[in-house]
Amino acid sequence: VATVNCSGYPKPACTMEYMPLCGSDNKTYGNKCNFCNAVVDSNGTLTLSHFGEC
């Protein structure tokens, strides 16, 4: 199972770096920062499905 360490999030701004991650909501997040901010917003219900686009 793929995991991402989201300690230290949410961050107020994310870079435009593109390293896609696919969330358990079947949505592609542009990078770890965007994904981790969404994880925090979801109160931990969002998880990583896999690295790369959905």
UniProtKB/Swiss-Prot annotation:
Ranges for domain Kazal-like: 4-54
Site annotation Reactive bond 3: residues: 16-17
UniProt keyword annotations, A-Z: Disulfide bond, Glycoprotein, Protease inhibitor, Repeat, Secreted, Serine protease inhibitor
Main location: secreted
Classification via InterPro entries: Bifunctional_prot_inhibitor, Kazal_dom, Kazal_dom_sf, Prot_inh_Kazal-m
Keyword Repeat: yes
Cysteine-cysteine disulfides: 6-36, 14-33, 22-54
Residue positions the entry lists as glycosylated: 43
Keyword Cell wall biogenesis/degradation: no
A Gene Ontology cellular-component term: extracellular region
Cross-referenced PROSITE patterns: KAZAL_1, KAZAL_2
Compartments in which it is found: Secreted
UniProt cross-references to Pfam families, sorted A to Z: Kazal_1
Record-level Gene Ontology MF annotations: serine-type endopeptidase inhibitor activity
Domain notes: Avian ovomucoid consists of three homologous, tandem Kazal family inhibitory domains.
Protein name: Ovomucoid
